[in-house]
């Protein structure tokens, strides 16, 4: 008996916005990860299961073949580097942007002048490093995993690099968005070996995902 395909997803917005894509492929997830304690979820297709992992771990599970394919944000993929992954489709879901934000009244233009030094808090260390290096700005990067908006408020950092959707959280903490680094959306990523060895099983799902993403789900 052939092992089922494994799809890696993270809880939250990506999971919810992937459900219509799965529905387009005729598949429903049998349990809700928000209420189930299970990390391996069956679907209505006996040849497909879903595993629930941290968003930042999706590329790793796919790269090493623990999952055949997955859905990950561009932010996660840029930090990961994309090694060992085939990225055939921008799914146009979980859209937002990665931006630089500073306290209201902070002179960002002066702070990033050539040769200046800036303390930046972020969990996107590699992306932030490349961004500021391209501008000729020396940065001290402070890696955080959450509550990024707090860092400038308590003097830990001058600025943050984080994902922004509506900007409401920034505004609530008296921060302003001063520079967009990149637009973010979630992409389908496929293990390169699985693409060759399980192509017949994968192709109908990948095609359905592509059609649904192009048609706005």
Curated annotation (Swiss-Prot):
The record's section on Gene3D superfamilies has: Periplasmic binding protein-like II
GO annotation, biological process: L-histidine biosynthetic process
Q: Where in the cell is it found?
A: Cytoplasm
Its recorded reaction(s) are: 1-(5-phospho-beta-D-ribosyl)-ATP + diphosphate = 5-phospho-alpha-D-ribose 1-diphosphate + ATP
Involved pathway(s): Amino-acid biosynthesis; L-histidine biosynthesis; L-histidine from 5-phospho-alpha-D-ribose 1-diphosphate: step 1/9
EC category name: transferase
Free-text function comment from the UniProt entry: Catalyzes the condensation of ATP and 5-phosphoribose 1-diphosphate to form N'-(5'-phosphoribosyl)-ATP (PR-ATP). Has a crucial role in the pathway because the rate of histidine biosynthesis seems to be controlled primarily by regulation of HisG enzymatic activity.
Q: What is this protein called?
A: ATP phosphoribosyltransferase
Which organism encodes this protein? Burkholderia ambifaria (strain MC40-6)
Identify the taxonomic lineage of the organism of origin. Bacteria, Pseudomonadati, Pseudomonadota, Betaproteobacteria, Burkholderiales
Q: Which gene is the coding source of this polypeptide chain?
A: hisG
